[in-house]
């Protein structure tokens, strides 16, 4: 505890706040483990791999989902330095988590795999860091691999950042080679935090909910300080509260007397209302508030929408509570109640398909819920009588409209030059428009395309990986809306439209998607005593049809010989009964059919 006593009184000149920018699998979590080892942050008996990836899901998928903040004490001959590491995700869907971490730092380690070179998502996060004027320290990792091409990767970084070749640190996080040099570079190259205002201001860059202590916020103090007992105010929600405790993670929670300018730590607010202290908010003193909040980061807008329904109708309230809790930790999650053929559920908005999968898995694991998820869709703009409406659910699309516009993204794809033809072919199939192409190095090309978001969120990433044998990487950002020839494909089972299976697609692909849907449903809908037509329709026109054959019930089995008219009478009666069933019978669609159709 001796070191922690000094922590709260440490001079701002001896603090360094930094984050790690890296692509998935480039060794960021392993490097974080080595930095923790070298600063003795974790006792040897408690060391595990990827110690900052606390969520079971993060370790299982080998990705970082939530940003984490850890304080390291680094002993050098010139004294003890406090290094605050803010660990960030690398996947495109979690760019928002990265932007939050960047807002809380003065410097960044740019970690690149020496065998793969820089990737598209790393590039996107690097530009984000440069916009915030962060000091960038380039680090080449995995130099111990036999396939590592250190000179080529170094040249790429030198060209990209305009640095000298000797400024690029060459390390192996796995073996620990060169890692101490990273700690020295953090101290020597990254500037200390600076205070600009006399009033207290702290930026909330993450938060979570504790059932006993209420909302716990992770914050970076930019001006002034925070201590236990202070009356403070969240500038966004204007909610006032008293601080119950402040402290830091090293990496276990450690209470401190105060958090001073430049320090990163947690604040226990004791608030029970999840929405009172949102991510991106500024905490200031209630008695002497700051005139304006810190420039947080833009409110992110969801790009992918889907319906989430509990399989048991009674679980509706549990699902609402679970979503509200996840939303506290994940400000980019959006949800609102909706009702359909599947019962009561929620229309949810996500940053991308991986984000959607992660939220679904967390709901099922952490809250023990059984869920049905409808097809993902995007937000369309529909012009009706000159008025623009937003539609996220295909069943809300009006019968007639003047124009429909779809969201477009600008995708940056980096791939080896021998795969350029395959990538261009894929982008054209997905209705992409080429914007530019440039060589990053003699072997790797950066292609830029404008693509409809609806085409990107389905199987674009899988196709890109398979066509380039896993060598391509991509990143995208929204660029607005464009008019498109889109239609709504409705599914009718026994003449009844099934809202949950409606999709909005480009007219050229309507037949193909409609055909695939009805064929899948034909396999999965159980046979009835009457024929069940399964149709896909655009407006009033049926574009594809399959029939679930009726099974025959042998009504004459009880007749032993005797008059043929007796059998005929029974068969006529059955025929009339079937005709009546066909008119009034509702076909129950099993959940497997919904799930299979959704995945098409």
Curated annotation (Swiss-Prot):
Name the predominant localization.
membrane
What Gene Ontology molecular-function terms does this entry list? GTP binding; GTPase activity; ribosome binding; translation elongation factor activity
Its recorded reaction(s) are: GTP + H2O = GDP + phosphate + H(+)
Query: Keywords, A to Z?
Result: Cell membrane, GTP-binding, Hydrolase, Membrane, Nucleotide-binding, Protein biosynthesis
Q: How does it sit in the membrane?
A: Peripheral membrane protein
Localization recorded for this chain is: Cell membrane
According to its UniProt entry, one GO biological process term is:
positive regulation of translation
Start and end of every tr-type G domain? 13-194
Q: What is this protein called?
A: Elongation factor 4
Task: Tell me which species this is from.
Answer: Rubrobacter xylanophilus (strain DSM 9941 / JCM 11954 / NBRC 16129 / PRD-1)
What taxonomic lineage is listed for the species of origin?
Bacteria, Bacillati, Actinomycetota, Rubrobacteria, Rubrobacterales
GN (gene name): lepA
């Amino acid at each position: 505890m001796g070191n922690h006593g000094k922590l709260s009184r440490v001079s701002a000149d001896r603090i360094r706040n930094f984050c790690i920018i890296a692509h998935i699998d480039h060794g960021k979590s392993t490097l974080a483990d080595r930095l923790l080892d070298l600063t003795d942050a974790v006792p040897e008996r408690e060391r595990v791999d990827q110690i900052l990836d606390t969520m079971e899901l993060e370790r299982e998928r080998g990705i970082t989902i939530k940003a984490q903040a850890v304080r390291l004490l680094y002993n050098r001959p010139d004294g003890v330095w406090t290094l605050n590491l803010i660990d960030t995700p690398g996947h495109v869907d979690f760019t928002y988590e990265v932007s939050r971490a960047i807002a809380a730092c003065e410097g960044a380690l740019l970690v690149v795999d020496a065998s793969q070179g820089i990737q598209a998502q790393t590039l996107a996060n690097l530009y984000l860091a440069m916009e915030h004027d962060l000091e960038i320290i380039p680090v080449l990792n995995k130099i111990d691999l036999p396939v590592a091409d250190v000179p080529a990767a170094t040249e790429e970084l030198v060209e990209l950042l305009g640095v000298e070749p000797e400024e690029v640190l060459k390390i192996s996080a796995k073996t620990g080679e060169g890692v101490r040099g990273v700690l020295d570079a953090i101290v020597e190259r990254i500037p200390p935090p600076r205070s600009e205002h006399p009033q207290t201001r702290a930026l909330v860059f993450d938060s979570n909910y504790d059932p006993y202590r209420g909302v716990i916020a992770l914050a970076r103090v930019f001006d002034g300080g925070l201590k236990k007992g202070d009356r403070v105010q969240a500038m966004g929600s204007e909610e006032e509260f008293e601080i119950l405790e402040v402290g830091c993670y090293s990496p276990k929670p450690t209470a401190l007397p105060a958090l001073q300018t430049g320090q990163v730590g947690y604040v226990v607010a004791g608030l029970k209302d999840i929405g009172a202290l949102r991510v991106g908010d500024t905490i200031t003193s209630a008695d002497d508030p700051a005139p304006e909040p810190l420039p947080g980061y833009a409110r992110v807008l969801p790009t992918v929408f889907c319906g989430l329904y509990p399989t048991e109708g009674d679980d509706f309230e549990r699902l609402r509570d679970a979503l509200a809790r996840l939303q506290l930790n994940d400000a980019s999650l959006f949800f609102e109640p909706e009702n359909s053929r599947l019962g009561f559920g929620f229309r949810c908005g996500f940053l991308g398909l991986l984000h959607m999968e992660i939220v679904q898995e967390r709901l099922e694991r952490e809250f023990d819920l059984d869920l049905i998820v409808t097809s993902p869709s995007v937000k369309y703009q529909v012009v009706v009588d000159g008025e623009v409406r937003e539609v996220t659910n295909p069943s809300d699309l009006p019968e007639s409209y003047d124009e429909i516009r779809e969201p477009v993204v600008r995708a940056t794809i980096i791939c080896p030059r021998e795969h350029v033809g395959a990538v261009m072919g894929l982008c054209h199939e997905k209705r992409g428009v080429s914007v530019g192409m440039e060589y990053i190095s003699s072997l790797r090309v950066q292609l830029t395309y404008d693509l409809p978001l609806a085409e990107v969120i389905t199987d674009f990433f899988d196709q890109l990986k398979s066509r380039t044998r896993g060598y391509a990487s991509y990143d995208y950002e929204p660029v607005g809306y464009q008019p498109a020839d889109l239609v709504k494909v409705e599914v009718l089972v026994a003449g009844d439209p099934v809202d949950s299976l409606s999709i909005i697609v480009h007219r050229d692909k309507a037949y193909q998607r409609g055909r695939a849907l009805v064929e899948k449903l034909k396999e999965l809908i159980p046979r009835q005593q009457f024929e069940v037509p399964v149709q896909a329709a655009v407006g009033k026109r049926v574009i594809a049809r399959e029939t679930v054959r009726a099974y025959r019930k042998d009504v004459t089995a009880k007749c032993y010989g005797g008059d043929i008219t007796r059998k005929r009478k029974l068969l006529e009666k059955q025929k009339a009964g079937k005709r009546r069933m066909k008119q009034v019978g509702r076909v129950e669609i099993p959940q497997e059919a919904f799930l299979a159709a959704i995945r098409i």
